[in-house]
Amino acid sequence: MTESKNSFNAKSTLEVGDKSYDYFALSAVPGMEKLPYSLKVLGENLLRTEDGANITNEHIEAIANWDASSDPSIEIQFTPARVLMQDFTGVPCVVDLATMREAVAALGGDPNDVNPLNPAEMVIDHSVIVEAFGRPDALAKNVEIEYERNEERYQFLRWGSESFSNFRVVPPGTGIVHQVNIEYLARVVFDNEGLAYPDTCIGTDSHTTMENGLGILGWGVGGIEAEAAMLGQPVSMLIPRVVGFKLTGEIPVGVTATDVVLTITEMLRDHGVVQKFVEFYGSGVKAVPLANRATIGNMSPEFGSTCAMFPIDEETTKYLRLTGRPEEQVALVEAYAKAQGMWLDEDTVEAEYSEYLELDLSTVVPSIAGPKRPQDRILLSEAKEQFRKDLPTYTDDAVSVDTSIPATRMVNEGGGQPEGGVEADNYNASWAGSGESLATGAEGRPSKPVTVASPQGGEYTIDHGMVAIASITSCTNTSNPSVMIGAGLIARKAAEKGLKSKPWVKTICAPGSQVVDGYYQRADLWKDLEAMGFYLSGFGCTTCIGNSGPLPEEISAAINEHDLTATAVLSGNRNFEGRISPDVKMNYLASPIMVIAYAIAGTMDFDFENEALGQDQDGNDVFLKDIWPSTEEIEDTIQQAISRELYEADYADVFKGDKQWQELDVPTGDTFEWDENSTYIRKAPYFDGMPVEPVAVTDIQGARVLAKLGDSVTTDHISPASSIKPGTPAAQYLDEHGVERHDYNSLGSRRGNHEVMMRGTFANIRLQNQLVDIAGGYTRDFTQEGAPQAFIYDASVNYKAAGIPLVVLGGKEYGTGSSRDWAAKGTNLLGIRAVITESFERIHRSNLIGMGVVPLQFPAGESHESLGLDGTETFDITGLTALNEGETPKTVKVTATKENGDVVEFDAVVRIDTPGEADYYRHGGILQYVLRQMAASSK
């Protein structure tokens, strides 16, 4: 770490017990004491990293003199203490670092200079797919298949962990990255050779903000920005506006943390918090347990905010002790927070905020969200009514969705069973079909009853609204003890009443850490969950990222052959179209407790207040209220089942891994030996032929529109992580390289191979490109006579051959969702030079710049619709060359020429927001910028 210039004489000594620590005292700078918590963390960061060039005393004073009412205008350089990764985004990061070692050497530098300068940690959690479910050996089967499919990736990651210094990998089967982070990896306060400072962490997953619940400032970034941070580059940002969110009251009986977070998500989305910090304060904060704070922080990307911070207080240190942190570390956290004015207690002076919201927690009511956005909250009491309102949208054929996948499918096509893989008895015969029907009570809604014969015997009738997947999944909820214990207890009560999950429901339980398995065993809850079909499926993200695996063959066939509108209910954070399963059209977020309830109901067309879930052994109707666990029951079970010893035991050898991990055949050497025949790991192309000096920025002439899209296009739409559909360009590539269909794996697992990923860009089966009438990865190819329909990738190849640049037109909230760098990498590799939208989500906008694609916005109040653009025009964009003179133009002129010669002109806003971003764009991307800096410094 470079020594700070310390121009404010802020370096001081902190005594904690019998130890002394150096630290940079905020009290040395007038004004710091009145700042919101999150800005105090930024202020300390600048004090500690002040170098007189990139970070000056003027920057420090700008933080101290922050004007809560002003719009962001002052750029600062934030240096995170560490970087966190998961394997889907982490594999391409390691690929890029390995490629950079070779590129540095080619530019005359030392390849061994390419190492993370700050701790970089990866948790492998994105690769497990739920093939087996509802059976005692589901976990073992899914792990076995995971290693078979991902052996090459895992060998590569082990090579990286042994080749790069300051880089550690938590093996698969341990848990979800964000839960492992808050339970083990997070420091809260760093001790770096006697220097104490706040733990700050950026991550290659948007839900990195879960750590905000621990008082750790951090957020999700694209993999390319994370790589730059690992290599010592600070994160360029504007001092943000901070939204103060006041919490009062206490959560009422019968309301879960999930209900609270869905309520907050709706409020903040309605308010508008993109590119803002959110900070929770008020008397209600102390009543929010740490696990609930983490759940709220986790959903920051769904709010749209950069982060969602809670301060450090007694609840924080209580959690650190529970999770096995050393007492010396806990003492440092408390002493440091108090010394810096970062500790919350009754004497804390309320900070000033840019904007204010307030929620009385006692007013929160049971809720779910869906069917396609996390912010679309629905009161549980109105869920049936709202489902019936939404259903016609999904049953009419206004937009044709390409569902030409055969009903009997291979596993990696998103349905059916793998050849030679998991057997057909995926769910327990004890809860097989016995004549149950969803056609009953269908009056008043679209209905298309289909009778299905169960392989286990019997038959049942499914219909629109069937719950095809009920999944306890995701970092948001699956290690929150209150809702996880609650799920086990509602299963127990349901089993006691003789209730069962419906036979058409795929039941999944994938906890966020092994600690959950431990307290389920202690509380003897597994037998009750298993009675509902919820066997342990894996420790990883599973359903929430689209790794729900295939539905049983007969159910998948019935859904697709009869075009049924199936639903999924998951305890996740995202429910975007096409994300959860290709067989499912409507996705709902709910607490783990409600996941169990919906599995029993079997349909979204259900009124939990007035309809019985079934009958008990005496023939009495059983309602949700009859099996809902009380707060006292949940708390008593938590006290009995959860202890510090559980955490200490599970994390004692967290980097060791299981026998399969330890026995992997790992390559050696400082540089990686690329295999040109590999379909998983390929040398990245971004530095091929890169000159020592950047090429001048040019305007864009004669561009064609590759895709014309609407509002809320997600990074899932742009770069899906889920299954690879046969016949698509990505599948054709794998076919040509000898990969069998049952070994396709997911697009997310292939992110180390740019050839697969560029073919999978804009390939989501639900993508609605307005240039064509069919949903999926299609466009019109204007290089061909009559501009016929073509795969987006195939058309891009023709455009490249013809020397024609490309643009994408979009609507509001373009790039919402995951911090998926491949959504920008794929955009770049397809030849797209500019994306023009009404608004961008923060991470994707930054990622586009990081890949040399310019983000542009239509003039305020305008859109491609209002301007009459239909996507058949030729585009010229002028004014970008001003960047060569060191200036970032506020707007550029866009001229769209229609086929009949008519012209539409407008001034597009250039969304290159900071000088640092302008530097990255001038160099063709952030990695090219970093590479040139490294090569120059090592000569």
Curated annotation (Swiss-Prot):
GO terms of biological process kind: propionate metabolic process, methylcitrate cycle; tricarboxylic acid cycle
> What does the annotation record about activity and temperature?
Optimum temperature is 50 degrees Celsius.
**Does the entry feature the keyword 4Fe-4S, yes or no?**
no
What does the entry say induces or represses the expression of this protein?
A: Repressed by AcnR, RipA, GlxR and activated by RamA. Repression by RipA is part of iron homeostasis and serves to reduce the iron demand under iron limitation. The activation of acn transcription by RamA serves to allow the increased carbon flux through the TCA cycle during growth on acetate. GlxR is a global regulator that binds to the acn promoter and presumably represses its transcription in the presence of cyclic AMP (cAMP).
**Mutant lacking the gene: phenotype:** Cells lacking this gene are glutamate auxotrophic in glucose minimal medium, show a strong growth defect, and secret large amounts of acetate. Deletion causes a strong selection pressure for secondary mutations within the gltA gene, which might be caused by a growth-inhibitory level of cytoplasmic citrate.
Q: Which keywords does UniProt give here?
A: Iron, Iron-sulfur, Lyase, Metal-binding, RNA-binding, Tricarboxylic acid cycle
EC id: 4.2.1.3, 4.2.1.99
Identify the enzyme class.
lyase
Please indicate which superkingdom the organism of origin belongs to.
Answer: Bacteria
Q: Which PROSITE patterns match?
A: ACONITASE_1, ACONITASE_2
Q: Where does [4Fe-4S] cluster bind?
A: 475, 541, 544
Recorded GO molecular functions are:
2-methylisocitrate dehydratase activity; 4 iron, 4 sulfur cluster binding; aconitate hydratase activity; metal ion binding; mRNA 3'-UTR binding; mRNA binding
| Pfam families (alphabetical) | Aconitase, Aconitase_C
What is the pH-activity profile? Answer: Optimum pH is between 7.5 and 7.75.
Q: Give the cofactors, semicolon-separated.
A: [4Fe-4S] cluster
Listed pathway(s): Carbohydrate metabolism; tricarboxylic acid cycle; isocitrate from oxaloacetate: step 2/2; Organic acid metabolism; propanoate degradation
On cofactor binding, the record's note says:
Binds 1 [4Fe-4S] cluster per subunit.
Q: Where is this region: Disordered?
A: 433-453
Q: Which reaction does it catalyse?
A: citrate = D-threo-isocitrate; (2S,3R)-3-hydroxybutane-1,2,3-tricarboxylate = 2-methyl-cis-aconitate + H2O
Annotated NCBIfam families: PRK09277.1, PRK12881.1
| Chain's role | Involved in the catabolism of short chain fatty acids (SCFA) via the tricarboxylic acid (TCA)(acetyl degradation route) and probably via the 2-methylcitrate cycle I (propionate degradation route). Catalyzes the reversible isomerization of citrate to isocitrate via cis-aconitate. Could catalyze the hydration of 2-methyl-cis-aconitate to yield (2R,3S)-2-methylisocitrate. The apo form of AcnA functions as a RNA-binding regulatory protein.
Family the UniProt entry places it in? Belongs to the aconitase/IPM isomerase family.
SUBUNIT field: Monomer.
Q: Which protein, by its recorded name, is this? A: Aconitate hydratase A
- Give the source species: Corynebacterium glutamicum (strain ATCC 13032 / DSM 20300 / JCM 1318 / BCRC 11384 / CCUG 27702 / LMG 3730 / NBRC 12168 / NCIMB 10025 / NRRL B-2784 / 534)
Query: Gene for this protein?
Result: acn
